[in-house]
Amino acid sequence: MSAPLTLSAEFRKTVEAQMAQVLRGIDYTFNQIIEKQKITPKDLKDEVESLQETFNLLFQKWSLEILYTLILKDTIGFGEIKKTLGVNSRTLSDKLKMLQTYGYITRDVTAGPPLRVEYALTVKGKNTVLLALPLLYYSSSK
């Protein structure tokens, strides 16, 4: 049995401190833009619709869990992802294909025996996880 992951508390503390600074900057920038523009209901609708595909993809069950697992392990095989997350093979296969199709992960097949399939984050996938971490930690804080 492996020891529990100890980076979580220290990492959370560091991320939360940096996140507070980033949030202030984003809030300031956002408010500056909003003050300069009059947003119509159509503008608002168009903005939300332009992000709908990303909302649907990233907030589906298992998507962020898979990406988070990959950032912690760098490269990882199908079986290890399945065991780590407790997801069934069919669902995991579908999610991995979807994440690969949208450019978040790569799939590398190494000829065997045994045949080995490993997954890794692309730059887009890594950046997405790094951007999601503050949201995840902030949302899970008590």
Question: Which sequence ranges carry the predicted segments?
Answer:
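N-terminal leader segment of winged-helix/HTH proteins
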Residues: 1-55
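N-terminal helix-turn-helix DNA-binding core of bacterial DNA-binding proteins
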Residues: 41-91
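Alpha-helical linker/hinge and terminal dimerization helices associated
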Residues: 68, 102, 131-142
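Conserved beta-strand edge residues that scaffold enzyme active sites
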Residues: 69, 112-113
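Basic amphipathic alpha-helical segments that dock to polyanions
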Residues: 70, 92, 96-102
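Residues within the helices of the helix-turn-helix
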Residues: 78-79, 97, 117
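A short, conserved structural fragment
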Residues: 100-110
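Basic, amphipathic "hinge/linker" alpha-helix immediately C-terminal to the N-terminal HTH DNA-binding motif
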Residues: 113-132
